[in-house]
């Protein structure tokens, strides 16, 4: 990679199934894992603006990876002019076509806020799961976010817009947003249904059978979860129309996927409000292990696992469970401040990078 975060230039060849990146905070450990995540999913869980990923005063950042099957993936982030994706040297018409060859699942200390944090964190987590299963979902999310921004801009223009013209534009927005919203809702619901039985099993294992997990999808529109797609679309369109007075007063759309919630319950009670810190950590760990298992089942091969400073946030028992579950099947990139959390077997089959290897501007490999 070149010009990415604090790395002027870094070249690294992975020689073992596991890469342990060891050192204090601030040397670029998380940045390395973030670069892999970007190549695999086109998304970063740490920021939403590409300009924050490009090294200070650099015109661009370049990420390139070679896979075992010979595939060459490349993503260029430009300070002026957006992104460009290439596969095997060929420029892709759509960034989306870069998704698939490098499936990866990330688990970071930030994910531990999944249970007790705001609903947006759970939506983002569920969206990452859906993207693993259906890469075209990225296009739906992009379309919806553009429509939502354009709708907000229309309201901000306020008095500058003729009321009749504004209502006609809102009618058009309602039709488009209802269609895209329905497709997002259905995919989120489908992914959660696939994930739930696996997550329930992991939660039972992690709690020695004492806790029963329930995952509930609560759409940001008043919908019957069992309805077919067309009734959903019509219901959302009607709700968008009815909420316009409140939308005008508050300045934000009150209906749609951006208001969805995923309810996580243990023993029938909300884990966010009543779960202990240990229960919440076990729940997040179980969800991540379920995600890993589901992707492996569906595609017949294990995804790359990115563990970013998460071991320090888990007690020794949960650390052991996570590392044991990963086993020998998954290629792992792990960042940590110390080697002490890794047993001898893990170290023996790992490539280890220490602070000097990741100093800003150093080229290795």
From Swiss-Prot:
Keywords assigned: ATP-binding, Cytoplasm, DNA damage, DNA repair, DNA replication, DNA-binding, Nucleotide-binding, SOS response
An annotated GO cellular component: cytoplasm
Coiled-coil intervals: none
Any GO MF annotation of the entry: ATP binding
Gene Ontology biological-process annotations: DNA replication; DNA synthesis involved in DNA repair; double-strand break repair; SOS response
Pfam families: SMC_N
InterPro entries: DNA-binding_RecF, DNA-binding_RecF_CS, P-loop_NTPase, RecF/RecN/SMC_N, RecF_2
Similarity comment text for this entry: Belongs to the RecF family.
UniProt function note: The RecF protein is involved in DNA metabolism; it is required for DNA replication and normal SOS inducibility. RecF binds preferentially to single-stranded, linear DNA. It also seems to bind ATP.
Name of the protein this chain belongs to: DNA replication and repair protein RecF
Annotated source species: Parasynechococcus marenigrum (strain WH8102)
